[in-house]
Amino acid sequence: MAMETCFRAWALHAPAGSKDRLLVGNLVLPSKRALAPLSVGRVATRRPRHVCQSKNAVDEVVVADEKNWDGLVMACETPVLVEFWAPWCGPCRMIAPVIDELAKDYAGKITCCKVNTDDSPNVASTYGIRSIPTVLIFKGGEKKESVIGAVPKSTLTTLIDKYIGSS
């Protein structure tokens, strides 16, 4: 049965003028009638499924640097959560999955960015980042809050809710 299904799928997706030949010992291939339930017309008429309704919602953490900082953070209409981190920092690796979850949970309500302090030291020094991880909240291009260290998700959600509630 599994082999027959495999051949059905192969026959359905094989190019019409394919010169490829399937060499199988003394195996009996399915008849044309066995291929009938898998009509190509029925498969091709399926309507597309929309997974995400909002094209502008970003559900992942965006990498910010000196080049795109103004466009991503300063000009953003929604509140922006920015994590300052470095690849060698253990606590930064601990908080990274939390920031990823927040980006998914608050997609369309906030923008989550991360800045590698090794790659963008000028951005970090502009905002007085001396310890990492540091999370800053921006709203309307203005720094509103900062949290230093690897904090629990609940701390960050409370902070985010404070700023998306006052939009």
Swiss-Prot record:
Keyword Chloroplast assigned: yes
Keyword Transit peptide in record: yes
One CC-aspect GO term: chloroplast
Cystine residue pairs: C89-C92
Pfam families: Thioredoxin
Alphabetic keyword roster: Chloroplast, Disulfide bond, Electron transport, Plastid, Redox-active center, Transit peptide, Transport
Transit peptide: 1-53
Domain Thioredoxin positions: 54-165
GO molecular function annotation: protein-disulfide reductase activity
Domain of life of the source: Eukaryota
InterPro entries, A to Z: Thioredoxin (IPR005746), Thioredoxin-like_sf (IPR036249), Thioredoxin_CS (IPR017937), Thioredoxin_domain (IPR013766)
Cell compartment(s), UniProt: Plastid, Chloroplast
CDD domains cross-referenced by the UniProt entry: TRX_family
NCBIfam families: thioredoxin
Recorded family membership: Belongs to the thioredoxin family. Plant M-type subfamily.
Task performed by this protein: Participates in various redox reactions through the reversible oxidation of the active center dithiol to a disulfide. The M form is known to activate NADP-malate dehydrogenase.
Assembly and interaction partners: Forms a complex with heterodimeric ferredoxin-thioredoxin reductase (FTR) and ferredoxin.
PANTHER family linked: GEO12009P1, THIOREDOXIN M5, CHLOROPLASTIC
Name under which the protein is recorded: Thioredoxin M-type, chloroplastic
Organism of origin: Zea mays (Maize)
